[in-house]
């Protein structure tokens, strides 16, 4: 969950700074107890632990039309190309983390509410460890899961 929070905040900050491309790569283990995120010299490209959770999250954002694309680079980093309107405003207006490590929120597919007249999406975690959006959950025979975040 911390990985997803880092990814959400990095995307928010990149859109505020109107960056087109983000690069995410794994962090280095400094010692047994400390883990630090390795940043580039200019500190413009945040680096976050790349996991299947990040990959699935980017896949959902791409399928729903919130980003232009994403790919894995040769060094193992994740490259995300953000999408902007012609006026220069980011397509993603708001990203909100719902479930937190200390306070998990679960819901069934019938109880998922439509925020902002259905313009946003809610991202859920299934019992198999996959991420799906609320539209996929209502189309398939999905029982319920943990609500991770909402994207508008």
Curated annotation (Swiss-Prot):
Keywords: Mitochondrion, Ribonucleoprotein, Ribosomal protein
Keyword hit for Mitochondrion: yes
Keyword hit for Amino-acid biosynthesis: no
Gene Ontology cellular component list: mitochondrion; ribonucleoprotein complex; ribosome
PANTHER family, A to Z: 40S RIBOSOMAL PROTEIN S15A (PTHR11758)
InterPro entries assigned to the protein according to its UniProt record, in alphabetical order: Ribosomal_uS8, Ribosomal_uS8_sf
Subcellular location: Mitochondrion
Protein species of origin: Marchantia polymorpha
Sequence similarity: Belongs to the universal ribosomal protein uS8 family.
Name used for this protein in its record: Small ribosomal subunit protein uS8m
Broad class of the protein's primary localization: mitochondrion
Biological processes per GO annotation: translation
Disulfide bond annotation, renumbered to this chain: none
Gene Ontology MF terms in the entry: structural constituent of ribosome
């Amino acid at each position: 969950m911390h990985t997803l929070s880092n990814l959400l905040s990095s995307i928010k900050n990149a859109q505020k700074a109107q960056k087109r491309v983000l690069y995410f790569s794994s962090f280095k283990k400094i010692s047994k107890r400390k883990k630090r995120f390795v940043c580039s010299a200019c500190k413009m490209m945040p680096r976050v632990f790349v996991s299947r959770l990040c990959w699935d999250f980017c896949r959902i954002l791409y399928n729903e039309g919130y980003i232009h694309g994403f790919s894995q680079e040769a060094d193992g980093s994740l490259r995300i190309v953000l999408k902007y309107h012609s006026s220069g405003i980011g397509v993603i207006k708001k990203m909100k983390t719902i479930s937190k490590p200390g306070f998990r929120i679960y819901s069934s597919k019938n109880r998922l509410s439509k925020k902002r007249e259905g313009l946003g999406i809610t991202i859920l975690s299934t019992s198999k460890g996959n991420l799906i959006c609320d539209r996929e959950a209502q189309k398939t025979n999905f029982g319920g899961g943990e609500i991770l975040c909402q994207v508008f």
